[in-house]
Amino acid sequence: MYLEQLKEVNPLTICITNNVVKNFTANGLLALGASPAMSECIEDLEDLLKVADALLINIGTLTKESWQLYQEAIKIANKNQVPVVLDPVAAGASRFRLEVSLDLLKNYSISLLTGNGSEIAALIGEKQASKGADGGKVADLESIAVKANQVFDVPVVVTGETDAIAVRGEVRLLQNGSPLMPLVTGTGCLLGAVLAAFIGSSDRSDDLACLTEAMTVYNVAGEIAEKVAKGKGVGSFQVAFLDALSQMKSEMIMDK
């Protein structure tokens, strides 16, 4: 249901994301049926966010200047009631990243927080191994998602071998996906943009259902791509993944 709605709405998804993943993110959104815009100019965003459906803030290539950009962009999005997705990339890897992430969460209206276990654990004060965007293995993603949902009072998606979605104290665990996905730079960052497109094209009446479908669509596309690229390597997997996103239909995830 939500996937078909996304394709019909063609949500304008503003992505202020990191320099490593911009091309992949834009192509992934286009494949799925969304309309990406990668603007980083406040004067431009003043107009774009009047008609946008969602805003992604991904702090991957963080600078002091980009911190100010995030703040101003979120202010404009909040003023125009545009949902904001925050991906606090490598939040546990440095004090500066943690400071920026907490500032955005505590001082602005965020609609969705998404990250891996190490990133979200750092935000709630739990020590976990972190090595940048890849993070470390975290034992209890469910409890981390629930606690972050309670602490920040926003829906939370925590990714890992099992993905956890927490909304208003309710949690859902998902186990789809491919082990090849973490081997392609940008799959986690593209996910944040995909989640933004899904919630931006929904009526927000049931975020848990919407996010569950978004995660399942994304992860099943990874499973399909793995089969197509079997024996070929991660380069072929990346292409197959974009192909799979472009061909996804709701009936393909009915039994997942």
Curated annotation (Swiss-Prot):
Keyword Glycosyltransferase applies: no
Superkingdom to which the source organism belongs: Bacteria
InterPro entries to which the protein is assigned, alphabetical: Hyethyz_kinase (IPR000417), Ribokinase-like (IPR029056)
Full protein name: Hydroxyethylthiazole kinase
Described purpose of this protein according to its UniProt entry: Catalyzes the phosphorylation of the hydroxyl group of 4-methyl-5-beta-hydroxyethylthiazole (THZ).
Catalytic activity, EC: 2.7.1.50
Family the entry assigns: Belongs to the Thz kinase family.
Catalytic activity: 5-(2-hydroxyethyl)-4-methylthiazole + ATP = 4-methyl-5-(2-phosphooxyethyl)-thiazole + ADP + H(+)
Binding-site residues, substrate: 38, 186
GO BP terms in the entry: thiamine biosynthetic process; thiamine diphosphate biosynthetic process
Any GO MF annotation of the entry: hydroxyethylthiazole kinase activity
Top enzyme category: transferase
Disulfide-bond pairs as recorded: none
Cleaved signal peptide residues: none
Organism: Streptococcus agalactiae serotype V (strain ATCC BAA-611 / 2603 V/R)
Biological or metabolic pathway of the protein: Cofactor biosynthesis; thiamine diphosphate biosynthesis; 4-methyl-5-(2-phosphoethyl)-thiazole from 5-(2-hydroxyethyl)-4-methylthiazole: step 1/1
Coiled-coil ranges from the UniProt annotation: none
One matching Pfam family: HK
Residues the record lists as binding ATP: 114, 159
